[in-house]
UniProtKB/Swiss-Prot annotation:
GO BP annotations listed: diaminopimelate biosynthetic process; lysine biosynthetic process via diaminopimelate
InterPro entries referenced in this protein's UniProt entry, alphabetically: DapD_Trfase_Hexpep_rpt_fam, Hexapep, Hexapep_transf_CS, THP_succinylTrfase_dom1, THP_succinylTrfase_N_sf, Trimer_LpxA-like_sf
Subunit composition and interactions: Homotrimer.
Gene Ontology MF annotations: 2,3,4,5-tetrahydropyridine-2,6-dicarboxylate N-succinyltransferase activity; nucleotidyltransferase activity
Catalyzed reactions: (S)-2,3,4,5-tetrahydrodipicolinate + succinyl-CoA + H2O = (S)-2-succinylamino-6-oxoheptanedioate + CoA
GO cellular component: cytoplasm
Transmembrane segments: none
Positions contributing to substrate binding: 105, 142
Major location category of this protein: cytoplasm
Protein name, as recorded: 2,3,4,5-tetrahydropyridine-2,6-dicarboxylate N-succinyltransferase
CDD domains per record: LbH_THP_succinylT (cd03350)
Record EC number: 2.3.1.117
Length: 273
């Protein structure tokens, strides 16, 4: 079934310029809808870790992009929270039974789009989770945090207030941004452009990471890009240019996570009861 979906999506992608809500075939519509449903339920993921390597399923990302070609804008929501969009909200039509079955908590006015997966014991404070994102068990998405399209958020992660996790749709990115299990992302930090923050890492407040951001390891003096090693404690910093005329922003790995760090950043089970 998945192979059939992939084949249909790949073929539709090659013809994407000619797709519209009027002209798309039933086969293409069904394939895209089936894929979005799979994302919404967590049966499909844009990226998954296999044998310690993140594998990106580009065809699923293409299905997300194609979905915007297949729908017109429509009025949705009610009362003061009305929207005019092509993608319905995830919780539209939910009653108490559906929320209890999901096992998560959604604080107004948090919004998740259909096609985003929210696992059990997740808490969504007033935040935004975009289509294709995957938010795993026990994670807190704090106030005004944004989880971008197709971003992958691991288990027991804390995304602090105002954090931005970049998406893949605009500007178009090859790979999603990934925050692995048990990470703490400090307030107003931004992680974008497919950067991977490996498990058990801590980003201090105001850390900005893109593919072009230098990640300087204080212990080794080495500079890397695009990936924060497991168990790192990262703070914002700067590095001087070769001629000493100026400095540029960087991220500095100041140490490895220890018991003291964990005590400061541990999740509060009372909030997830």
């Amino acid at each position: 079934m998945t192979l059939d979906l992939q084949t249909t999506i790949e073929q539709a992608w090659e013809n994407r310029a000619n797709l519209s809500p009027v002209d798309a075939s039933a086969e293409v519509r069904d394939a895209v809808e089936h894929t979005i449903d799979g994302l919404d339920l967590g049966r499909l993921r844009v990226a998954e870790k296999i044998d310690d390597q993140w594998i990106v399923h580009q065809w699923i990302k293409k299905a997300v992009l194609l979905s915007f070609r297949l729908h017109d804008n429509a009025v949705m929501g009610q009362g003061p929270l009305q929207f005019y969009d092509k993608v319905p909200t995830k919780f539209a039509g939910y009653g108490e039974a559906a929320f209890k079955a999901g096992g998560y908590r959604v604080v107004p006015p948090a919004v998740a789009r259909r096609g985003a997966f929210i696992a059990r014991n997740v808490v969504l404070m007033p935040s935004y989770v975009n289509i294709g994102a995957y938010v795993d068990e026990g994670t807190m998405v704090d106030t005004w945090a944004t989880v971008g399209s197709c971003a992958q958020i691991g288990k027991n992660v804390h995304l602090s207030g105002g954090v931005g996790i970049g998406g893949v749709l605009e500007p178009l990115q090859a790979n999603p941004t990934i925050i692995e299990d048990n990470c703490f992302i400090g307030a107003r930090s931004e992680v974008v452009e497919g950067v991977v923050v490996e498990e058990n890492s801590v980003l201090a407040m105001g850390v900005f990471l893109s593919q072009s951001t230098k990640i300087y390891d204080r212990a080794t003096g080495k500079v890397s890009y695009g990936r924060v090693p497991s168990g790192s404690v990262v703070v914002p910093g700067s590095l001087p240019s070769e001629d000493g005329s100026h400095s540029l922003t960087c991220a500095v790995i100041v140490k490895r996570v220890d018991a003291q760090t964990r005590a400061k950043t541990s999740i509060n089970d009372l909030l997830r009861a």
